[in-house]
Swiss-Prot record:
Record-level Gene Ontology MF annotations: calcium ion binding; calcium-dependent phospholipase A2 activity; phospholipid binding; toxin activity
Quaternary structure note: Monomer.
Cross-referenced PROSITE patterns: PA2_ASP, PA2_HIS
Catalytic activity: a 1,2-diacyl-sn-glycero-3-phosphocholine + H2O = a 1-acyl-sn-glycero-3-phosphocholine + a fatty acid + H(+)
Name used for this protein in its record: Basic myotoxic phospholipase A2 PhTX-II
Residues making up the signal peptide according to the UniProt record: none
Any one annotated GO CC term: extracellular region
Cofactor binding summary note: Binds 1 Ca(2+) ion.
EC number per UniProt: 3.1.1.4
Biological processes annotated in GO: arachidonate secretion; lipid catabolic process; negative regulation of T cell proliferation; phospholipid metabolic process
Notes on temperature effects: Optimum temperature is 40-45 degrees Celsius.
SMART domains xref list: PA2c
Cystine residue pairs: 26-116, 28-45, 44-95, 50-123, 51-88, 58-81, 75-86
Organism whose genome encodes this protein: Bothrocophias hyoprora
Amino acid sequence: NLLQFNKMILKETGKNAIPFYAFYGCYCGWGGRGKPKDKTDDRCCFVHDCCYGKLTGCPKWDIYPYSLKSGYITCGKGTWCEEQICECDRAAAICFRENLDTYNKYGYMFYPDSRCKGPSEQC
């Protein structure tokens, strides 16, 4: 669920997903193609896309159980799909925090899709 993912990102980075991550680089936001631009785009967004891609048949909009306690994001018990999607989102939010030092606000925020050329990377 995008609202839950945004809360995870905000908790880990202090930044709202929109505008900071939804249109960042070539893989943050919907879909992606070309070469990832930096660690945030590659390690976080591209890997998140791959994580979701492995979950065919799982609805990405469903609300999943999770908690924010003692500074940690914990995915709760739910359906198999809910648990897996939560783990994808949790890993990406943590990745964003771990790669804040490479986040390029002036170079890749609102990066135009037209500059993402070439085939999509393989997971």
